[in-house]
């Protein structure tokens, strides 16, 4: 049991720390803070915690006579840490007669402590306060030191005071109920205080991380009974007692640090700002990522960034950064904003560099605009006594993963530097394996602290191979080996990142591992690249020797499952070693522990990298095992059985491969660099680099047994190396390549060629390094040629010829391929660009290196050395994608079965997006050049075709993925695993992979009659069933294309597909309504049976809800068909996809999370406009949907069917905060009204919660009024539905009538004005809409030919005027009375709509053009056309609206014909030039046109015959009617007769589709209706009413 401790602060022992000390806390308050009134303030969540209830009860029962206890609960969450909440508390205190002797007890986390402390500081000019912190963060940070504050809209903690509490009573028992994430969040501050002040405590924290995480991860939710209410509540429970000593100690030590610092600097003038380590950067991240990211999580990232800054400035060692990184990760905290789990948690939010710097600029530590950061000197010690000024350039560097390298021309040639590279990766990994297998304690010094060795150390610990501790402030690893006796299978897979060395060494080591009681295998896995790298020869060898190993994914690569029940037998082992020497070293090191002595024979030719094999043998000898080289067989070794004996100390040589970079820097810049611990006695082959590569190229090289010094020749005078065999030092070829790029001689015949060979293994390293260097050197203007086992580099003749990497759009980045050696070598070449050019500093363009952090694999501090020690000018850079701000034209890949519609929809897709269409089968046939796909299959077989098809797809999508193409792929592309990987990668990188599918029965019927394609070798249904899962896993979108049997159905499909494709490509965004709106709820089992009635059901709605849980079947194909049916039947009304679970009032099984995830995936691929996401679902389900939502909006919903939670209950506040943290787009709360006052409480809740659009309603008869008052997306029913989906639902008309009766909708009067208007259909049109929608308005006629009369009588004289429809002769005359004109009215030059703006101001509009457009688009013309010309017949007023409309549709040219040619010319000249209006003057002119006319609008009188000349022109144009994506369409502007002569001619003689003028009449009136009322018009009912006679 831990003891009770008191910690002094500011000269008083006022901080008490213990476990289960509530009695001591009560006595301290009663005895040392005597008062007539004690006030406990906590949040409503804490009121549910039994320990809080016990504490308050004990305090109440212990009160002395004459004292009273009050308790006040505030709403939880940062959103309530406001001046308003503070005022509420103060009003409560005043109402209860609290005076100056009041003692306030703040029980809670930092929010409560900060706010209640501020109340105490100001109430009655200051009253006493006792802090009782309940969160880890509050215990160790916010409760200590007297800082108090509330938030403001402009920032957190901007208003507050220093007010020291009487006591801080810290009982770690509170932590039992702290949620897991909050617990881990608090550890950031604990680690921070140890990091800046207490190195010993940091070490203790390091050694207890595993225990902490195990206990905290075991946190669970339990049910407890409330003492006062009897309610059963869910709370978190963590078994603190399982780590009590550690928890108590970490809290106590952290408090001691803060107390000591505060005592020295209470008001944060100097020393106290050291406590802000990690906060300068952390607060900037928090400002962007809140509320998804917690304070401690952001501070954790901030600590890493600020530590990296310290390292970058040459103050902090890389080892110390590594220790900090490890401990934060070990306690479950993020170490980078790019970690996948953290990105998912923060919903993929971006953290732009300029925003981070701007947020940092308002840090309280700053001096004006100068930023200050706490600099760490070592673990446990800060650099100086306060924060330091830092410049933006250095900050930008550490904040980004892209770096700008400026020319090295600032570096003086006489510069001489000594650089010590980190420990050798090769030696470090070997030493760890040998020491883990060895017996005894070994102190390993100069170990490389990198990703590779981190994975190796973790694996050794997971396999229980050794005990690992640290000395010398983390610089020395102390490894106590157990002689291989304790090796045990780990429960979890060993993740090795991209650590190739670790993966190969551990593969053989795993064969020595013992089975545990629960597991008899070890799984090795890694990242995506690691899962492509070869390990086959080693696995083959071990399998042959008796070890059972399974490939879990791809043959020949990780992940591997290595069975521990099959022993490593030993004896003769044959191994192919032409790919990697690491296979050899892996077997060599483990061979002494085989059952029998090992004879290792390397077969298949000369082994690669023999020197690394020699290195392993020498190191084995140091650990006590001597390997004998066979004298009778080449490349054969005899290894005896035995056990390694660990030497007391082993010093790792610096990495010779890494040493090549500073030495090459000297060579290229003409400076001098010494590497003091690598010479000719080195174990590493790369130590030869200076002698064998740099010296022949013109450098002065001095090498001793243990040091190497290089002095470069004058800059620009390096010589090519005609030929070098780099087989002994293959990793150094990249460095040699960049040196060769700037090498030239005076021999005109040599072409400055440097030939490097012996490096074939470099193709299977972290990337294909030979290809990577060839690709990236080309960006600098350096030519190369790949050789079978090497590369030729054609050096440039002058440094001036070295190019800045760029393309037609500007500078581009240098790719690193996630390869440390690629990045480091190319950083040297980058500094030589513009080296000798004299430009003003502002004009010098740097070279951008991408993924700079990949150097962490072997030299995390490389950039620090390049900048701080070698003097290079570096800067950080925002990723180019952030900077452009442009939408890229990401190509669309169509996949799916034959006959799924890829050809037709592919053509439509290309036209809608303006992309190029490319059929991959056609492209294949072009490249094959010997016939069709069918011919290729006949000659080579399907497997060869699939292989060739995969290569073609990879090359095509890599080259043209951003080029704006629609790629139509063959149905079987997904049959090939390589193709599937490329498809998935393209989708994950932001490309569109669209699966087109249709009913399989229809597909079978079609395919059985298609002779043009190679025949399936099996049943079509079997093919579909095999491929279906592949189509699903490879695609990120899916569209079901129903079979179309007539032109009308094709029109519906095309329109639906156009809406879909523009949505998934980001060209059409879902707009959440900001006005009164509604959606109808559908609960049918099968919509296909109700398709005919759906248009009536959704009348007047802004969206339609599909209750998927009510469907007859939940299979994906069925649900997809329902969505397709709904889209078609409702004219693509936005869909709300709702999967309501049983406990939230629906029918879907509560625990079927797999089925739920599958159906949400269907919805997201279908790009539904809204997904209803229940806030009670598991967090992983919620985050999966939130992180993959794409362009879909999320409605976060919560329902209370049992009337369990009044609107004041914290349940709603907690759910609201949860919805905010999920960053949903709309919040939907549904309560149940048991009394009318519940509706008033709901409205108060709505008024106080405006951060997000909120749907809030009460169910039941009493709650109907809440549906009327709800402002957006109100769920409604319809008179055409058999029943409503929820109790109390109303129709849209009912809602509007009730709302109008309450004064919510003011009755308006509307008129049609002009002369004559007696036969106008406008009153019928509008009044029908008002009646059906339940609106209180009335539309009438006002006949006059005087605009003046309209102004006096209606514009000035009618107070309830809602709008005017204007007809002849007033369309021009009334314009002078308008205060504003829309663009349409201005360009057309006439108006037909008056819109009141208030205060006797009016806007003039013209909806004729909308009527024209909607008449066309509702009959199959796309919303946007491409390569289509339009025709307008006539030159009157309607013709102007027609031209405006055709231009809006996208017609690239608009022809006008008219009886009087001069009128056509006059019309043409009145429009802007970009409209491209052409007056067709003669028939001969038309004959010579090479245009296809797709759309025509007839604006000539329908009651007169066309004159001969006009008719001749019209017929010529109609003859040119053609468009391959829609039927040529003519709209008649005249309302009567139903069929005009122009319509008859176009339809009967030229097969045009014709649209009667009544559609134009209704569409333009409906546009007016929606402008005036803001409501959706019931189009079909209005159309029927208008055209009835």
Curated annotation (Swiss-Prot):
Q: Where does 7-phospho-2-dehydro-3-deoxy-D-arabino-heptonate bind?
A: 125, 141, 147, 157, 189-192, 258, 272-276, 279, 295, 364
For the region Shikimate kinase, give the residue spans.
891-1081
Listed A to Z, the keywords are: Amino-acid biosynthesis, Aromatic amino acid biosynthesis, ATP-binding, Cytoplasm, Kinase, Lyase, Metal-binding, Multifunctional enzyme, NADP, Nucleotide-binding, Oxidoreductase, Transferase, Zinc
Recorded superkingdom: Eukaryota
List ligand-binding residues for Zn(2+).
Answer: 189, 279, 295
InterPro entries attached here? 3-dehydroquinate_DH_AS, Aldolase_TIM, Aminoacid_DH-like_N_sf, DHQ_synth_AroB, DHQS/DOIS_N, DHQS_C, DHquinase_I, Enolpyruvate_Tfrase_dom
SUPFAM superfamilies given in the database record: Aldolase, Aminoacid dehydrogenase-like, N-terminal domain, Dehydroquinate synthase-like, EPT/RTPC-like, NAD(P)-binding Rossmann-fold domains, P-loop containing nucleoside triphosphate hydrolases
As its record notes, the protein acts as a catalyst of: 7-phospho-2-dehydro-3-deoxy-D-arabino-heptonate = 3-dehydroquinate + phosphate; 3-dehydroquinate = 3-dehydroshikimate + H2O; shikimate + NADP(+) = 3-dehydroshikimate + NADPH + H(+); shikimate + ATP = 3-phosphoshikimate + ADP + H(+)
- Please list the GO biological process terms of this entry: amino acid biosynthetic process; aromatic amino acid family biosynthetic process; chorismate biosynthetic process
Positions binding NAD(+) in this chain are 43-45, 78-81, 109-111, 114, 134-135, 156, 174-177, 185
Entry-linked NCBIfam families: aroA, aroB, aroD, Shik-DH-AROM
Name by which UniProt lists this protein: Pentafunctional AROM polypeptide
Give the originating organism: Zygosaccharomyces rouxii (strain ATCC 2623 / CBS 732 / NBRC 1130 / NCYC 568 / NRRL Y-229)
State the gene name recorded for this protein. Answer: ARO1
């Amino acid at each position: 049991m831990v003891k009770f401790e008191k910690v002094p602060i500011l000269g008083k022992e006022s901080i008490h720390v213990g476990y289960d000390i509530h009695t001591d806390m009560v006595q301290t308050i009663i005895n040392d803070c005597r008062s007539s009134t004690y006030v406990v303030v906590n949040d409503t969540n804490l009121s549910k915690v039994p320990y809080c209830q016990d504490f308050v009860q004990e305090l109440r029962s212990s009160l002395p006579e004459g004292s009273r206890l009050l308790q006040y609960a505030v709403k939880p969450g940062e959103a309530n840490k406001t001046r308003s909440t503070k005022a509420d508390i103060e009003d409560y205190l005043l109402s209860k007669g609290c005076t100056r002797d009041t003692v306030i007890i703040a029980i809670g986390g930092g929010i409560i402590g900060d706010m209640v402390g501020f109340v105490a500081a100001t109430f009655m000019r200051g009253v006493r306060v006792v802090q009782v912190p309940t969160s880890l963060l509050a215990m160790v940070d916010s409760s200590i030191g007297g800082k108090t504050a509330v938030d403001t809209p402009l920032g957190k903690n901007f208003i507050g005071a220093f007010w020291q509490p009487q006591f801080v009573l810290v009982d770690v028992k509170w932590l039992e109920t702290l949620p897991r994430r909050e617990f881990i969040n608090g550890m950031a501050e604990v680690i921070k205080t140890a990091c800046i002040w207490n190195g010993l405590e940091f070490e203790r924290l390091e050694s207890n991380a595993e225990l902490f995480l195990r206990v905290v991860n075991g946190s669970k939710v339990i049910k407890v009974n409330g003492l006062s209410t009897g309610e059963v509540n869910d709370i978190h429970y963590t078994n603190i007692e399982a780590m009590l000593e550690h928890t108590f100690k970490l809290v106590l030590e952290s408090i001691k640090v803060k107390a000591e610092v505060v005592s020295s600097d209470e008001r944060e003038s100097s020393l106290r700002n050291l406590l802000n380590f990690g906060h300068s950067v952390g607060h900037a991240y928090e400002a962007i990522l809140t509320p998804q990211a917690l304070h401690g999580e952001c501070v954790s990232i901030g600590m890493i960034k600020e530590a990296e800054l310290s390292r970058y400035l040459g103050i902090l060692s890389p080892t110390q950064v590594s220790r900090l990184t490890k401990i934060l990760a070990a306690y479950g905290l993020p170490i980078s904003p790019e970690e996948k789990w953290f990105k998912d948690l923060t919903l993929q939010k971006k953290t732009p560099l300029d925003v981070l710097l701007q947020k940092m600029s308002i840090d309280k530590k700053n001096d004006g605009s100068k930023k200050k950061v706490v600099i760490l000197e070592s673990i446990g010690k800060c650099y100086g006594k306060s924060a330091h000024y830092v410049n933006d350039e250095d900050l930008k560097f550490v904040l980004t993963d892209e770096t700008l390298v400026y020319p090295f021309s600032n570096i003086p040639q006489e510069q001489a530097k000594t650089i010590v590279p980190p420990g050798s990766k090769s030696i470090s990994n070997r030493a760890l394996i040998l020491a883990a297998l060895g017996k005894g304690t070994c102190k390993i010094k100069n170990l490389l602290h990198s990703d590779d060795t981190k994975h190796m150390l973790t694996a050794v610990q997971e396999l229980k191979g050794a005990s690992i501790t640290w000395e010398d402030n983390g610089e020395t690893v102390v490894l106590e080996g157990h002689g291989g006796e304790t090796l045990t299978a780990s429960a979890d897979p060993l993740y090795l990142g991209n650590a190739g060395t670790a993966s190969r060494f551990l593969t053989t080591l795993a064969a020595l591992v013992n089975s545990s009681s629960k597991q008899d295998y070890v799984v090795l896995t890694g990242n995506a690249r690691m899962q492509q790298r070869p390990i086959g020869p080693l696995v083959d060898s071990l399998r042959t020797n008796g070890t059972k190993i399974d490939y879990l994914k791809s043959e020949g690569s990780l992940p591997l499952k290595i069975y521990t029940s099959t022993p490593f037998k030993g004896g003769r082992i044959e191994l192919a070693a032409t790919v990697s020497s690491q296979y050899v070293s892996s077997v060599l090191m483990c061979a002494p522990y085989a059952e029998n002595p090992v004879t290792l024979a390397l077969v298949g030719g000369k082994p690669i990298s023999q020197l690394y094999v020699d290195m392993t043998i020498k190191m084995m000898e140091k650990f006590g095992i001597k390997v004998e080289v066979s004298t009778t067989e080449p490349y054969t070794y005899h290894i005896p059985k035995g056990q390694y004996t660990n030497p007391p100390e082993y010093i790792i040589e610096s990495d010779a491969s890494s040493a090549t970079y500073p030495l090459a820097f000297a060579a290229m810049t003409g400076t001098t660099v010494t590497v003091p611990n690598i010479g000719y006695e080195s174990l590493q082959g790369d130590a030869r680099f200076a002698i064998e590569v740099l010296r022949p190229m013109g450098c002065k090289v001095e090498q001793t047994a243990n040091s190497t010094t290089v002095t470069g020749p004058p800059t620009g005078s390096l010589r090519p190396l005609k030929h070098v065999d780099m087989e002994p030092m293959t990793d150094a070829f990249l460095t040699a390549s960049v040196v060769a790029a700037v090498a030239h001689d005076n021999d005109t015949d040599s072409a400055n060629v440097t030939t490097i060979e012996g490096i074939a293994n470099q193709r299977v390293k972290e990337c294909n390094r030979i290809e990577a260097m060839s690709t990236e050197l080309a960006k600098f203007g350096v030519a190369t040629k790949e050789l079978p086992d090497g590369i030729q580099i054609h050096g440039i003749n002058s440094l001036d010829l070295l190019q800045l990497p760029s393309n037609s759009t500007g500078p581009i980045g240098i790719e690193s391929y996630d390869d440390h050696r690629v990045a480091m070598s190319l950083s040297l070449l980058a500094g030589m660009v513009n080296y000798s050019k004299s430009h003003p500093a502002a004009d010098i363009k740097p070279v951008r290196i991408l993924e700079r952090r990949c150097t962490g694999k072997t030299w995390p501090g490389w950039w620090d050395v390049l900048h701080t020690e070698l003097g290079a000018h570096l800067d950080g850079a925002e990723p180019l994608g952030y900077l452009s701000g442009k939408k890229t034209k990401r190509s669309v890949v169509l996949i799916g079965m034959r006959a799924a519609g890829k050809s037709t929809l592919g053509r439509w897709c290309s036209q809608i997006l303006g992309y190029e269409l490319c059929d991959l089968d056609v492209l294949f046939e072009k490249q094959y050049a010997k016939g069709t796909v069918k011919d290729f299959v006949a000659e080579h077989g399907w497997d060869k075709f699939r292989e060739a098809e995969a290569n073609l797809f990879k090359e095509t999508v890599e080259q043209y993925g951003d080029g704006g193409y629609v790629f139509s792929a063959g149905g079987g592309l997904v049959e090939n695993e390589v193709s599937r990987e490329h498809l998935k990668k393209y989708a994950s990188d932001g490309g569109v992979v669209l699966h087109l599918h249709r009913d399989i029965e229809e597909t079978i019927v079609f395919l059985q009659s298609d002779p043009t394609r190679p025949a399936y070798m099996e049943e079509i249904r079997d093919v579909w069933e095999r491929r279906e899962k592949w189509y699903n896993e490879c695609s990120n979108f899916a569209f079901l294309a129903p079979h179309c049997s007539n032109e009308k159905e094709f029109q519906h499909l095309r329109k639906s597909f156009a809406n879909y494709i523009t949505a998934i490509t980001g060209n059409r965004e879902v707009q959440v309504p900001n006005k009164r709106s509604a959606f109808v709820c559908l609960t049918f089992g099968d919509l296909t049976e109700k398709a005919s009635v759906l248009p009536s059901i959704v009348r007047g709605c802004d969206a339609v809800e599909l209750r998927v849980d009510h469907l007859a079947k939940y299979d994906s194909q069925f649900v997809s068909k329902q969505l397709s049916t709904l889209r078609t039947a409702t004219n693509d009304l936005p869909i709300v996809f709702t999967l309501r679970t049983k406990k939230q009032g629906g029918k879907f099984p509560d625990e079927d999370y797999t089925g739920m995830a599958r159906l949400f995936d269907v919805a997201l691929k279908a790009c539904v406009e809204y997904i209803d996401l229940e806030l009670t679902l598991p967090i992983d389900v919620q985050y999966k949907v939130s992180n993959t939502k794409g362009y879909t909006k999320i409605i976060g919903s919560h329902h209370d069917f049992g009337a369990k939670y009044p609107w004041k209950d914290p349940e709603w506040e907690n759910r609201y905060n949860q919805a905010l943290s999920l960053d949903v787009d709309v919040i939907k709360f549904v309560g149940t009204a048991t009394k009318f006052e519940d509706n008033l409480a709901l409205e108060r809740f709505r008024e106080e919660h405006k951060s997000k659009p909120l749907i809030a309603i009460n169910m039941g008869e009493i709650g109907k009024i809440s549906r009327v008052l709800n402002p957006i997306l109100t769920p409604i029913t319809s008179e055409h539905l058999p029943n409503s989906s929820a109790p109390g639902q109303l129709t849209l008309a009912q809602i509007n009538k009730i709302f109008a009766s309450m004064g919510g909708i003011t009755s308006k009067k509307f008129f049609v004005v002009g002369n004559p208007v007696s036969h106008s259909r406008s009153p019928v049109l509008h009044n029908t809409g008002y009646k059906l929608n339940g609106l209180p308005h009335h539309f009438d006629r006002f006949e006059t030919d005087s605009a003046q009369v309209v102004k006096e009588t209606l514009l000035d004289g009618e107070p309830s005027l809602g709008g005017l429809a204007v007809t002849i002769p007033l369309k021009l005359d009334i314009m002078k009375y308008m205060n504003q004109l829309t663009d349409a009215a201005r360009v057309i030059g006439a108006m037909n709509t008056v819109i009141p703006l208030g205060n006797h101001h009016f806007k003039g509009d013209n909806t004729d053009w909308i009527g024209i457009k909607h008449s066309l688009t509702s009959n199959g013309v796309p919303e946007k056309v491409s390569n289509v010309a339009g025709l307008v017949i006539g030159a009157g007023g309607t013709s102007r609206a027609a031209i405006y409309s055709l231009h809006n549709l996208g017609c690239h040219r608009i022809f006008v014909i008219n009886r009087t040619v001069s009128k056509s010319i006059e019309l043409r000249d009145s429009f802007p030039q970009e409209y491209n209006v052409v007056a067709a003057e003669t028939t001969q002119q038309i004959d010579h046109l090479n245009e296809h006319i797709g759309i025509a609008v007839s604006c000539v009188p329908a009651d007169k015959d066309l004159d001969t000349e006009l008719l001749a022109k019209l017929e010529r144009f109609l003859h040119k009617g053609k468009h391959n994506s829609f039927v040529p369409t003519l709209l008649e502007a005249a309302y009567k007769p139903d069929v005009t002569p122009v319509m008859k001619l176009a339809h009967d003689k030229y097969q045009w589709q014709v649209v009667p003028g009544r559609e134009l009449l209704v569409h333009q009136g409906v546009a007016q209706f929606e402008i005036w009322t803001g409501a959706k018009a019931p189009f079909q009912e209005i159309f029927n009413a208008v055209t009835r006679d």
